Regions:
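Conserved thiamine diphosphate
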Residues: 1-41, 65-66
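Conformationally flexible catalytic loops at phosphate/diphosphate-handling active centers
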Residues: 35-127
Length: 173
């Protein structure tokens, strides 16, 4: 997945997945980079849980208006969209891509803070739980296994948890 070019988020719960999808629109539009929100295929898709679906008006307030950038599909003016870049353009394409992908971590946190103000649920790229001087083991998790790990660290005070929500780009902070 390193070179696919997609930003990757992993959701611990169905609520987090829905909330992250809403936040992802801003990130994808701001940077012109596709975003995937990953849901555990078996554990989350084969269970049910209550989620709060926000009113469309609240989501519309949160999301910026769609900005037309000149790359919209128009049958009267066909264009080629895809991942193939000829060698003479690849250097600039790759430089531009990495300049944008390096903005993901900070922009993701800013979007999450705005989301918390609007909807009252807090998310961050990385969540550290019970990590301190007493910690001997740290469980690093993605997705729904995090919920199981939360139960483990309650029983074992020397075990901490590091939950990754943002995986690509891998958080550096």
């Amino acid at each position: 997945q390193r070179d696919t070019g997609w930003v990757q988020y992993y959701g611990e719960s169905s609520q987090e997945v829905l909330d992250t999808i809403i936040q992802s629109y801003i990130l994808a539009e701001a940077l012109d980079i596709p975003v995937m929100v990953v849901l555990d295929a078996f554990y989350q898709s084969h269970t049910s849980e209550n989620i709060w679906v926000p009113d469309a008006e609240l989501v519309d307030e949160f999301l910026p208006p769609k900005a037309l950038k000149g790359n919209e599909i128009d049958p009267n003016d066909p264009k080629d969209f895809g991942g193939l870049v000829p060698p003479e353009h690849y250097g600039k394409f790759n430089t531009d891509y990495w300049a944008d992908i390096n903005k993901v971590e900070d922009l993701s946190e800013k979007i999450a803070k705005r989301f918390e103000k609007q909807f009252g649920r807090k998310y961050s790229n990385v969540e550290a739980v019970n990590i301190g001087k007493q910690t001997k083991i740290v469980l690093v998790t993605l997705s729904s296994i995090t919920t199981t790990a939360r139960g483990v660290i309650k029983k074992y005070p020397d075990v901490g948890l590091l939950k990754l929500r943002l995986f690509k780009t891998f958080p550096r902070k």
